[in-house]
Amino acid sequence: MAASARPVGVGGERATSFAMACSLLSRYVRQNGAAAAELGLGIRGEGEAPRAAPATMSLLPGEAERKKETMELFPQSAGFGQQDAITADSAADAREQEPEKRQLTIFYGGKVLVFNDFPADKAKGLMQLASKGSPVAPQNAAAPAPAAVTDNTKAPMAVPAPVSSLPTAQADAQKPARANASDMPIARKASLHRFLEKRKDRLNAKTPYQASPSDATPVKKEPESQPWLGLGPNAVVKPIERGQ
């Protein structure tokens, strides 16, 4: 019993001490209301008016108007509505204002000129200018090829493929090759002739004697005399006498 009564007594002492602390705090607040407000406990003194919130100065003038704008949760421009009709009308007006453009092909001087996205009004003006050209050419100057302007506003026209001039170029390249082949023997003969002349000059300069045997003086050969054989030209032939 004594053990069970002890905790109860301790709890009672704590309750009385807490109640005394609260009573002392309330008395202090009543006596010093301004000091309690400065503590930041949210307790106002007697006769004290509530303080107004400090006014803030906006440095951005357009910020207030932007905050006032309300968000439109159901915009009319979304989906198929009036905005689509306005967009279609503006696109149609833009197409009407923009001139029609097609492909233009011009044949002049043996050349084919193709222009893409050429305005129709400019094509008509160009055709009128070509039709006003003088058909009579000057006598001294060569007559240029007539210009042919075709307007492709109705249907596109296929551009003719250029004709290849490869066989003509090969024939022109073979002509000088053949001419050089015919000139090669003559050139070789001329170079061989020059080489022989230079060689002859070098031989004449190196050898002290005359090269050609026709220019040399003939040497006279003396008849050989060999008396010891008795068959030479100086030998005396004695006639043989026959006995009667």
Curated annotation (Swiss-Prot):
Induction: By jasmonate, wounding, and cold, drought and salt stresses. Down-regulated by abscisic acid (ABA).
Protein name in the entry: Protein TIFY 10b
Basic and acidic residues composition bias: residue spans: 194-204
Pfam families: Jas_motif (PF09425), tify (PF06200)
Keywords: Jasmonic acid signaling pathway, Nucleus, Transcription, Transcription regulation, Ubl conjugation
rRNA-binding is among the record's keywords: no
Organism: Oryza sativa subsp. japonica
A single GO cellular-component term on record: nucleus
GO biological process: regulation of defense response; regulation of jasmonic acid mediated signaling pathway; response to wounding
Region (Disordered): 174-244
Subunit comment: Interacts with BHLH148. Interacts with COI1A and COI1B in a coronatine-dependent manner. Coronatine is an analog of jasmonoyl isoleucine (JA-Ile).
Domain named Tify: residues: 97-132
Domain remark from Swiss-Prot or TrEMBL: The jas domain (185-210) is required for interaction with COI1.
InterPro entries per the UniProt record, alphabetical: CCT_CS, TIFY/JAZ, Tify_dom
Function statement: Repressor of jasmonate responses.
Processing and modification events after translation: Ubiquitinated. Targeted for degradation by the SCF(COI1) E3 ubiquitin ligase-proteasome pathway during jasmonate signaling.
Major location category of this protein: nucleus
Family as reported in the entry's similarity comment: Belongs to the TIFY/JAZ family.
Gene assigned in the entry: TIFY10B
Subcellular location: Nucleus
Segments carrying motif Nuclear localization signal: 187-194
Residue positions of motif Jas: 185-210
